[in-house]
Amino acid sequence: MTQRPWSKLQRKTHNIAALKIIARRSE
């Protein structure tokens, strides 16, 4: 099952979202 160009992109966007949430929290 190597047909997953999505998971990498999703993980990246999820990471960005998490970072934004963390940044907003520590503000």
Swiss-Prot record:
UniProt source species: Escherichia coli (strain K12)
Induction remarks: Expressed approximately equally in exponential and stationary phases (at protein level).
Record's protein name: Protein YkiD
One Pfam assignment: YkiD
Gene from which this protein is expressed: ykiD
